[in-house]
Every structure is written in structure tokens, then in C-alpha cells.
Regions:
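N-terminal secretory signal peptides that target proteins for export/translocation
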Residues: 1-7
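Bacterial N-terminal signal peptides
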Residues: 13-23
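Cleavable N-terminal signal peptides
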Residues: 16-17, 27-28, 93
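Bacterial Sec-dependent signal peptides at the C-terminal "C-region" and cleavage site
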Residues: 23-32
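Short, flexible loop/turn elements at secondary-structure junctions
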Residues: 79, 115, 157, 189-191
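Disulfide-stabilized, aromatic/cysteine-rich ligand-recognition loop
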Residues: 168-192
């Protein structure tokens, strides 16, 4: 055993020296170079990316209506909440739209959920809802009137419930027909 250690001792010493030189170069050069640590890394200032361009092509018609050119749908500039200052359940929303005259038109209807998607704009983040809550900005163009509802009733309904479009997240939901909280309707018509 002693003979084995005598043979291996020079090899182990060389291995230890190689380890120190390879993995700890500052230790072997410390006396010669008076090792001084580098300055800490300072990252460049953050520059946010430019905003994405909107995919929508909205035109303010100047008569209380807005037209989305691609879909050729005409929308009321004010939704029911901005117009009346209160929320509406599904039944009241249907009646509101049926009796609406805006921009010289009286053929307004309740939109389907997919049609709300034609004015939902994820490049927008406007604090224009009825309570102006900065925690819940609407993905809606500032061409639309201030004081808007957070979500809108659609014409898609059953015996108890109807589909709605939520303009904070862009997700559709199902709500009971008599629900009212922070909701309304934005009337639409075909403009072809």
C-alpha cells in the first residue's frame, strides 16, 4: 500500500496543481497581478417595444356612429350605459336596441358575440368604462364614447341565459338574462 502511494503521489500532486490552474486562475496569479474584481454589470435602460398597430379600420361617421370598414358593420358610438347612465339586463337591452334611432337609422339590432370581436382591439387599453377603473381598461378604440359598459349582451340566448362579450379580456361569457351589473349593449347594423 505504501508503495502504491509513493507511485501515485507525484501524479496526485500534478492533478491538484492542474485543477488549481484551470479552475482557480486568480489564486495562482493573485500575488503577481494583485487581482481586482471587475466592475459590476450595468444593464442598458429598458426601452419598451413600440405598440402594435391596430388591425381595425374604424371610421367616425360624425353622426353618432362608427363604421368598421372590413366587416362593413356600423356601430353606435355610445353604448346603452354611456347613453342611459345605467346597466341593462338582456330584456331591457333588446328593447333599447329595437327602439333606438341614431345617425338617422332605426334598423339597429343586438350583435352576435363574434361581431363584438370586430371592434375588440387588443392594441388598445383605454380607461373609458363607466367607473374609469384603471385596473380594468377596455380594449376598445377611443373613438367610442366614454362611460362604456365592461361587457355587452349578444343576441345569442336561450331560456335562461345569453352570451356576452367582455371588453376587458376579450372573452365571451354566459350570463343569466336578468343580470345587470356593469353591462349593457352596443347596437349594430349592417352597412352594406
Amino acid at each position: 500500500m505504501i508503495q502504491f502511494l509513493k507511485i501515485r503521489a507525484p501524479f496526485l500532486s500534478a492533478l491538484l496543481l492542474a485543477f488549481v490552474v484551470i479552475f482557480c486562475p486568480g489564486v495562482t496569479n493573485a500575488e503577481r497581478n494583485h487581482y481586482v474584481p471587475r466592475d459590476p454589470y450595468v444593464a442598458p435602460p429598458y426601452v419598451p417595444p413600440p405598440p402594435l398597430p391596430s388591425r381595425l379600420n374604424l371610421i367616425d361617421n360624425g353622426d353618432g356612429t362608427i363604421t368598421e370598414k372590413k366587416s362593413k358593420l356600423m356601430w353606435t358610438k355610445k353604448d346603452s350605459f354611456a347613453d342611459l347612465g345605467r346597466c341593462l339586463n338582456w330584456y331591457d337591452s333588446k328593447s333599447y336596441v329595437e327602439n333606438l334611432t341614431t345617425g338617422g337609422h332605426n334598423d339597429w339590432r343586438m350583435p352576435e358575440v363574434w361581431e363584438y370581436g370586430e371592434i375588440y382591439d387588443n392594441t388598445e387599453s383605454n380607461v373609458m368604462a363607466m367607473d374609469h377603473d384603471p385596473e380594468n381598461p377596455l380594449a376598445l378604440s377611443s373613438l367610442f364614447a366614454d362611460g362604456a359598459a365592461y361587457w355587452y349582451w349578444s343576441s345569442e340566448h336561450g331560456k335562461c341565459c345569453a352570451r356576452t362579450a367582455y371588453f376587458v379580456t376579450g372573452l365571451p361569457f354566459v350570463r343569466t338574462l336578468d343580470k345587470c351589473s356593469k353591462g349593457g349593449v352596443r347596437a349594430v347594423r349592417n352597412n352594406s
